[in-house]
Amino acid sequence: MSAPETTAPLQPPAAPAASLPGSLAESLASSGITELLAQLDRELIGLKPVKARIRDIAALLLVDKLRAARGFSAGAPSLHMCFTGNPGTGKTTVAMRMAQILHQLGYVRRGHLVAVTRDDLVGQYIGHTAPKTKEILKKAMGGVLFIDEAYYLYRPENERDYGQEAIEILLQVMENNRDDLVVILAGYKDRMDRFFESNPGMSSRVAHHVDFPDYQLDELRQIADLMLSEMQYRFDDESRAVFADYLARRMTQPHFANARSVRNALDRARLRHASRLLDDAGTVVDDHTLTTITASDLLASRVFSKAAPDARTPAKE
């Protein structure tokens, strides 16, 4: 009986030692990804699962570069994504940072973000949709195409709707140019689920699904502080407590949009702050006066004219 055949361990092609990266830490430092991830962490409060997924994708691309330097290759991964969540949860901001990370790691050439909706892709008459969609894809090539409320591309109730034509063009480009374009579809989770059920071709091309949770009360307070700091304003102790009360009330009302609603509330507070200073124009202003949002700037909101909920205990992380 002949001896069993043995398989030699996989040996990578030889490469000059000087050309190979050293440790993962060294490769991470030289890639510039650490600062981009840190910037994302500074910009976005909370969202730990989202940040973890972005880090995983960055790690995959970084390790792929190390493998390629040693002669290993599994082919470029498909990185088309779906971001689901309510408005104001950071989907567009994460898409922007994702584009920069992909560029930094050499996955895309330019690293820019092109954000569109159905109206940018779908025409209003025969022969109009294909040129519109192709023009957007041309602009996005080498970067990331972010399609907000992507489910509006598909309208099964209207047989003459041109959205399906845009979808077919997108599918072709997502398959043939996946090494130079990342498409991110975004919207409410339940509607995106129905969209994928009705469009299996699109579902099969989207490998990464990232859910953006709503912010909790404490996170929204931190977001408000961050936004005010960026605008060079501040709360005093009283207005900080009033704004927390404002958020607790506003979160229970219709059309609450997380960080977007926080920004809108702060913008209105700035208007009232400026109006208050103008009404008291004889007073000499100083840095404190010009930068401090007071309780009166917030209490004028119509949110306080409606009854607050009897009890509300925001979920904790």
From Swiss-Prot:
InterPro entries: AAA+_ATPase, AAA_lid_6, ATPase_AAA_core, CbxX/CfqX_mono, CbxX/CfxQ, CbxX/CfxQ_RuBisCO_ESX, P-loop_NTPase. SMART domains: AAA (SM00382). Belongs to the CbxX/CfxQ family. The keyword ATP-binding applies. Seems to be necessary for the expression of RuBisCO. Residues 1-21 are annotated as: Disordered. The lineage of its organism: Bacteria, Pseudomonadati, Pseudomonadota, Betaproteobacteria, Burkholderiales. The keyword Protein biosynthesis does not apply. It comes from the Bacteria. ATP binds at residues 85-92. Keywords: ATP-binding, Nucleotide-binding. This is Protein CbxX, chromosomal. Pfam families: AAA (PF00004), AAA_lid_6 (PF17866). Gene3D superfamilies: 1.10.8.60, P-loop containing nucleotide triphosphate hydrolases. PANTHER family: AAA-TYPE ATPASE FAMILY PROTEIN / ANKYRIN REPEAT FAMILY PROTEIN, AAA-TYPE ATPASE FAMILY PROTEIN _ ANKYRIN REPEAT FAMILY PROTEIN. Transmembrane segments: none annotated.
